[in-house]
Amino acid sequence: MPRLYLGKIPYNARERDVERFLKGYGKINNISMKYGFAFVDFEDSRDAEDACHDLDGKTMEGSSMRLVVEMARGKPRGNDRHGSRSPRRRSRSPRRRSRTPPRRRSRSRDRKRSRRSRSRSSSRSRSPVRESRRRSESRSPSPKRDLKREASRSRSPLPAKDRSRTRSGSPPKNGGDRKRSVSRGRSHSRDGSNRSVSRSPSPGSPKD
């Protein structure tokens, strides 16, 4: 069945307006109105060709837009708001997906990957041991530091309490010397008195 495509039809147009526009070009079997275009099925292909040849570029009553009239190709699909030409059928050939067999991995690659994974796991397992050693070494004081601390403690002056104790416990040097001189003077005086007593004659002794 021959079909005619009418494009750029006014949006407010109806089937009656299309019939008036195509009046005198044969018998019309069906009119399918869309938004901005229409498809008209003629009974005779000659009538459709004559209408396409004569009415292309002419205006419809009540509109200043020139219509597009041409032979339709296929059934209409969707709405054409801008009044473009009839959409063409796109042949959608089914795409054949070539199923390629999965590639076989060589054994050498698998071995290399297994070695890498083993080396990574071993390095990860060894790393916490090294960190614990480093922490223990950093926390444990070195012998050199202990010697320096002992030397600084021995050189550091005594606190105020220790000084007072040492001062109160040790007798002054001048006082000791004075006591010694006094004791020596007393001993000398005692010896002299004894000697004088022994030398002086007793009152009862006869004189020479």
Swiss-Prot record:
Name of the protein in its database record: Probable splicing factor, arginine/serine-rich 5
Name of the coding gene: rsp-5
Keyword DNA-binding (UniProt): no
Extra remark: RNA-mediated interference (RNAi) of rsp-5/rsp-6 resulted in fertile animals that exhibit excessive sperm and delayed oocyte production, and sterile animals that develop morphological abnormalities of somatic gonads.
Residue intervals of the RRM domain: 2-74
Record-level GO cellular component terms: nuclear speck; nucleus
Location in the cell: Nucleus
SUPFAM superfamilies cross-referenced by the UniProt entry: RNA-binding domain, RBD (SSF54928)
Species annotation: Caenorhabditis elegans
Pfam families associated with the record: RRM_1
GO MF annotation terms: mRNA binding; RNA binding
